[in-house]
């Protein structure tokens, strides 16, 4: 008896780290193109930092008593040199590290933006993944409320550009360090009076990071959090003036907002302004963008004291909203699919495809799937499935006569007839196709 072949195990991706397939990539490209145009309009420059950083960057920058550092980071020890490394869970600390390391602020403030994958070890659910993507901005060296207002208004302009509705702005002020210290004393006193009612997470944070107790999602603690001393009541004149200045600028630009005294954010580097853009269309994961001011962070990471603010938004959540509101654009096909029959025709077709690409047209040349010549019928089926506007047909007869067939697969051909096929001299092919596409586009606009 012959030995049966051992079945090879099929490998799959890591849970919570998703592939972006071709049918979805068009939506990603649409979003990326839209947001990049917006960032250029505000004078922001792209910065790209490594995915892996020293763990200390995040423990010092984000804060050791935070969910991200305590529970969510992908950290490991480099076997070669014993360095403690972490796959970035967010990118603000890394951008600040790069700005300090490369002395980027020596000649004045910088407006920077980034886009890329982040990593957090948490339970995957709708809109929340272990590998997720963010786009963010960092305005380094700007101290006034006008910078806060500008980065908030950038988000509003992006929602408008994408056609998104129902995303609401919540703002708060975390004040200055001495104001947070005074509030912390009173907050701990208040929470101690309710210690028996606190859950384990709140008890753990009571003396290490009590401000985060106010941000609890536990329904049983909502009343306690709601009645807790509010940080906004501890603000001094400078913090109040900054917060009021922000509100005036938002109102002057018709940006509606709600002041949420319990909005504290999950990272320790924030001060003064914090904000979130939230929606009720994504279930529990309602925050689509968030940010604020982090003036202490640059000094905290070894730079000179420098004011800064920024935001980050989760791309997957924005794309979910685009799908939810049927705003995803149709995926465009190529301009031309080149079909051929016979060896001489294949060679001429290959050359013609390259010449068409020289003019800026998007062209698919039919390649054999199994090495054997494909029938004309199967090639035309592939051409139609590709989404191409036109099929360009090279047959033996056409090659002998110095001509080529052109068939409109979408809309009308050069003579205005739907799905018409015409014979065109090879030397006139490019001009014919360009004119036919212009005519087809005009028909589509009518």
UniProtKB/Swiss-Prot annotation:
GO terms for biological process: histidyl-tRNA aminoacylation. InterPro entries: aa-tRNA-synth_II, aa-tRNA-synth_II/BPL/LPL, Anticodon-bd, Anticodon-bd_dom_sf, His-tRNA-ligase, HisRS-like_core, HisRS/HisZ, HisRS_anticodon. This is Histidine--tRNA ligase. HAMAP family: His_tRNA_synth. It holds the Pfam family HGTP_anticodon. The keyword Transport does not apply. PROSITE patterns: AA_TRNA_LIGASE_II. It catalyses: tRNA(His) + L-histidine + ATP = L-histidyl-tRNA(His) + AMP + diphosphate + H(+). The keyword DNA repair does not apply. Its main location: cytoplasm. Belongs to the class-II aminoacyl-tRNA synthetase family. It is an enzyme of class 6 (ligase). Its EC number is 6.1.1.21. It comes from Burkholderia multivorans (strain ATCC 17616 / 249).
């Amino acid at each position: 008896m012959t030995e049966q072949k051992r079945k090879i195990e099929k490998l799959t991706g890591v849970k919570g780290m998703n592939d972006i397939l071709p049918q979805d990539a068009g939506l990603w490209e649409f979003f990326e193109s839209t947001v990049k145009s917006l960032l250029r309009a505000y004078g922001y420059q792209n910065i790209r930092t490594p995915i892996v950083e020293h763990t200390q960057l995040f423990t010092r920058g984000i804060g050791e008593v935070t969910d991200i550092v305590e529970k969510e980071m992908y950290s490991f020890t480099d076997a070669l040199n014993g360095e403690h490394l972490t796959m970035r869970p967010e990118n603000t600390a890394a951008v600040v590290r790069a700005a300090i390391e490369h002395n980027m602020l020596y000649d004045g403030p910088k407006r920077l933006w980034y886009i890329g994958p982040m990593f957090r070890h948490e339970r995957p659910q709708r809109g929340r993944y272990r590998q997720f993507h963010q786009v963010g901005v960092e305005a380094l060296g700007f101290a006034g409320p006008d910078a806060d207002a500008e980065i908030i208004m950038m988000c509003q302009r992006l929602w408008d550009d994408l056609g998104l509705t129902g995303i609401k702005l919540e703002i708060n002020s975390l004040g200055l360090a001495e104001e947070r210290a005074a509030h912390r004393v009173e907050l701990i006193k208040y929470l101690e009076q309710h210690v028996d009612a606190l859950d384990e997470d709140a008890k753990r944070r009571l003396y290490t990071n009590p401000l985060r107790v106010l941000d609890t999602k536990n329904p049983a603690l909502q009343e306690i959090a709601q009645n807790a001393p509010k940080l906004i009541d501890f603000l001094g004149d400078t913090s109040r003036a900054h917060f009021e200045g922000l509100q005036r600028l938002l109102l002057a630009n018709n940006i509606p907002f709600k002041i949420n005294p319990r909005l504290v954010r999950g990272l320790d580097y924030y001060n003064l302004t914090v904000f979130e853009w939230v929606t009720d269309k994504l279930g529990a994961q309602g925050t689509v963008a968030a940010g604020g001011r982090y003036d202490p962070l640059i000094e905290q990471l070894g730079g000179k004291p420098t004011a800064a603010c920024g935001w980050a938004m989760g791309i997957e959540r924005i794309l979910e909203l685009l799908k939810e509101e049927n705003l995803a654009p149709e995926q465009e096909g190529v301009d031309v699919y080149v079909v051929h029959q016979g060896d001489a025709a294949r060679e001429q077709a290959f050359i013609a495809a390259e010449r068409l690409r020289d003019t800026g047209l998007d062209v698919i040349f039919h390649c054999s799937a199994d090495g054997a010549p494909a029938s004309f019928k199967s090639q035309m089926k592939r051409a139609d499935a590709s989404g191409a506007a036109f099929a360009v047909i090279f047959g033996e007869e056409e090659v002998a006569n110095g001509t080529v067939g052109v068939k409109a697969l979408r809309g009308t051909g050069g003579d205005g007839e739907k799905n018409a096929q015409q014979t065109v001299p090879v030397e006139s092919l490019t001009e014919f196709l360009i004119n036919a596409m212009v005519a087809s586009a005009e028909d589509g606009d009518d």
